[in-house]
Regions:
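Short glycine/proline- and acidic residue-enriched helix-loop micro-motifs
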Residues: 1-5
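A short, well-structured juxtamembrane/interface segment
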Residues: 6-27
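Glycine-rich phosphate-binding loops that contact phosphosugars or nucleotide phosphates
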Residues: 32, 39-40, 44-179
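N-terminal hydrophobic or amphipathic segments with adjacent small-residue motifs
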Residues: 22, 29-32, 37
Length: 180
């Protein structure tokens, strides 16, 4: 597993993660994204950048924000439990070779742990963008997964440093897929 903790090295590791995303997209796979609270908003920004043009006109790219549909989230939470809100969707929508992109600002939510386990069951690579030094996520990741750890103490500061503001999705993802 690749793990990064120094902010100055984030761009090259974001590039590494983007190569996995590009590879999945070029193989007709999709990106599933999730996060809780403010991280759900960051997940939505990534999804928008993929589905709609980002800085220039180009074809839409397949991305599903698992945190976006409040009716689905509340139905799953009501009928099952809150811990299942992402994993249940991933089990229905995810396929081997897809990417699960997780934004987590430092909390240790059980719903994130469950979606990681579900991703591994379906052979979906996890890219986790985290902000917690001793969190729950890191031990759950496999060798094929990628963790980009933004080592900041404040969840607001972590949101400020999210990859959307650091050219994520990177230019090569936007250019390479548009050329297909």
């Amino acid at each position: 597993m690749i793990r990064v903790t120094v902010l100055s090295y984030l761009p090259e590791h974001i590039e590494y993660a983007s190569q996995h995303i590009v590879s999945a997209l070029l193989n007709d796979k999709k990106i599933l994204i999730c996060g809780n609270g403010r991280s759900a908003t960051t997940a939505q920004l990534f999804s928008l950048a993929m589905l709609n043009q980002f800085e220039r006109d180009r074809p839409s790219l397949p991305a599903i924000n698992l945190a976006a549909d409040i009716a689905t989230i509340t139905a799953i939470a009501n009928d099952y439990q809150f811990d299942d809100i992402f994993s249940k969707q991933l089990r229905a929508l995810g396929q081997s070779g897809d990417i699960l992109l997780i934004y987590n600002d430092g909390n240790n939510p059980a719903n994130i742990a469950k979606v990681i386990a579900s991703a591994h069951e379906k052979e979906i690579t996890v890219i986790a963008i985290t902000g917690n030094e001793n969190g729950l996520i890191s031990p759950l990741l496999q060798e094929t997964d990628i963790e980009i750890r933004v080592s900041l103490n404040s969840s607001i500061r972590i949101q400020d440093q999210n990859p959307e503001s650091s050219d994520f999705p990177p230019s090569n993802l936007r250019t390479r897929k548009a050329e297909e």
